[in-house]
Amino acid sequence: MDWKIRYAQQYQNLKELITLLETEDTEKFISLTESEALTLHAMMMTSMPYFILMKPNTLEIINKIWTYRSENDSNICFTLDAGANVHVLFPKSEKEQVYEFIKSELVAYCQNGHYICDRIGFGAKPLPI
């Protein structure tokens, strides 16, 4: 994929993601978020020189998330960084169920069983000097 086309695509996707967050369209947010993550990796795999930064466990986690979402009517989804790391996204209302899913199903695919739990913060704040 030409980088100019990809840049334009990601810009449009970012604008749409903002709208989807504002309108709370969870289904479309999930679809676009996962598509954006996978498109980035597809671009790396088809570039010259090509890169495969996903690992087998990355795909295992993605498939487990898809299965969990389908079987539990959940709003869990994922995004990926530029490496093999999966970032699991979910509404606060599903926190307990998703944490249990992570512990029982996903941690086995994490390096040394380690994972990081994070949440949305309050944004940047100036520090007193």
Regions found by a protein language model. Name each.
Residues M1-I129:
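C-terminal nucleotide
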